[in-house]
Amino acid sequence: MSASSHPAAQSGDADLVVTATAEPTAASELSAAVKAWLTRRVSVDTGRIADIVLAAYEALANCADHAYRGEEATGVMSIEARHDTDARTVRLCVVDRGHWLDPRSGPENPARGRGLKLMRALCDDLTVHGTAHGTRVCLQFEHCPAR
């Protein structure tokens, strides 16, 4: 996996953007980058950090699993992190350029389909915007003051 990490170029952009090939091992590596960023930025307990990282991992794992299914080459995924110190919120967005897969469109499998439920349980707000040209999953977490 080749991940690239960089601070955003403009103040209105994310504080951190990390991009990697959309594969399962990358989900863990990108989640670790988010954890390191959170530890430097926000003053919350380790349980809250773990919840945020787990939600991020789940969004990344879903992307690695579904975004480029059926395509010859594996695409990329990015995670964007933003800390709004005034609002005391953290917003994480996982972005891909694959094809949106409606979770209700496939056959029911009792061993799968818990990702969105888990993300909803862990974050304060979840938005999913999927199109034929990519998907953007954003998770917002409240009560995250600056260090």
PLM region spans:
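Conserved beta-strand-loop-beta-strand hairpin that lines the nucleotide-binding pocket
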Residues: 1-21, 64-147
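A short beta-loop-alpha structural element at the N-terminal edge
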Residues: 20-26, 30
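Conserved catalytic/ATP-binding subdomain
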Residues: 25, 47-50, 75
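Generic recognition of well-ordered alpha-helical segments
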Residues: 32, 36, 121-124
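Conserved short strand/loop->alpha-helix "switch" segment adjacent to the catalytic nucleotide/phosphoryl-transfer site
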Residues: 35-57
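Histidine-centered phosphotransfer motif of kinases
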Residues: 50-70
